[in-house]
Amino acid sequence: MRILFSLDNYDHATGGAEMSMQALAHQIALRGHEVRVFQRDRSVRTYDDGPIHVHTHPLPASHLIRDQDLDTIRWNRHWEPLLDHFINETRFDLIVTQNRLLFSTVKVATRRHIPVAVFVRAFSMFCPLQFRSREALTECDRRCETCLPWRMRLKYRFIRRNLGQYEAGLRSATLLIANSIYMRDVLHRFYNLEAEVVYPAIEWKRYESPTRRADRVLFVKPQYVKGLPIFLQIAAQMRDTPFLVAGKIGRHTRRKFRGLDNVECLGWVKHMKDVYARTRVLLGPSIWPEPFGRVFVEAAANGIPSIASARGGIPEAVGKGGILIKDIFDSSRWVEALRRLENPTVYAICAENAYAHAKKFTAAESLNQFIRSVHKAIGLEL
């Protein structure tokens, strides 16, 4: 069977959506299917990613002012004929897509009567601000024009056009796949559409550390939406606890860490397994209602329990392998939870539960969920 992945980003980024799609593509190829990828890139080229044939093509974007909404409109306008021409050369049995090129991909696939599966992993198709600090199911009133900053209001018609095209693409897809039950519920609330749930594929070998010298509390991506102000309060109140911070830190943010001698800032980290080797607890005080929360599963694969916000899809990623905080802006709740995990008995139970929960998110299990969803909706046997 021939399967095409039509994507704006397959392997030139390190986000969860890209890594999950790479893992799925490889799992499908290992089953003997012919897998090709057609992705946006800076130049026209063809190369092999293991058993997968990757083809790239550039798309025009403004060189002066980068604007995601305008670029998305421009990209899809040019991607449609490029994809149409690419499909002329090979007959595909299934097309898989996600994110910014989904509506042009669905349009071409529908016109050619090829089944198309769309992964719903991001908030961009529902909210121009991607619910930076609002809970999508309970706090969004769907009146975009009232909460946009004034600079975005000036291009509101382009924002509405993109949202409309995303909706049209979702409605025309043969199969919709959400990366969590939470995202499935968001899709139903906003567009009254149903989706199958396929959890992200986590390739354990990327994150499992054979040696552990764990004594640190880890915070990943020091950004406001990830809970930076909450973390700073926690670190200031727990001077006796050593913390690690992994992720790029700008000059303005770095100033906020002054005086916190118990915090070690690692900067951007390529191999997270080295960080997990030093981690005893993962801290996730996210203000943003994350669609899933891949980092919690990565940590759990090493038997590391998490203390995390009870928002978005995070509870699904944490499971019973940690402690969830509802009142996220009360730093005392986080401190109390960290103190609880200082108890060896409590920690051992959470660590064991975390490792057991992580087994639900292997690449093989994600593939099985995908196969069942495709067979149910399309009737194809992968």
Where are these regions (language model features)?
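Acidic donor-binding loop of glycosyltransferase active sites
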Residues: 174, 277-291, 304
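Membrane-proximal helix-turn-helix segments that form the acceptor-binding/catalytic region
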Residues: 137-175
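Short His-centered aromatic/hydrophobic patch
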Residues: 76, 97-102, 120
